């Protein structure tokens, strides 16, 4: 189960259907993403990370650090 996905959604007061609409999937599909029953496509992970302002690692419970990595600027 991806706890961070659920927590971020609930913190914004959104339903699974709201996020499913953002991703253009059915609510049951999004529910399966949160429960870890389905692999989340990378395109959906990118949308979710931008929407929530965090890293994909955080979304997938691979880190407890909410903020995304800082981008290094090219010199």
Predicted regions and their residues:
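Conserved hydrophobic/aromatic packing and binding residues within compact polymer-binding modules
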Residues: 5, 19-20, 30-33, 59
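Short, charged recognition helix plus adjacent turn
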Residues: 60-75
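Hydrophobic side chains within well-formed alpha-helices
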Residues: 1, 5, 55-56
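Recognition helix of helix-turn-helix/homeodomain-like DNA-binding domains
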Residues: 24-39
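DNA major-groove recognition helix of helix-turn-helix
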Residues: 34, 52, 60-63
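Short basic helix-loop element that most often maps to the first helix and adjoining turn
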Residues: 3-22, 47, 73-74
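Conserved amphipathic alpha-helical interaction elements at protein-protein interfaces in regulatory
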Residues: 7, 11, 51-54, 65
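DNA major-groove recognition helix of helix-turn-helix/homeodomain DNA-binding modules
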Residues: 24, 43-58
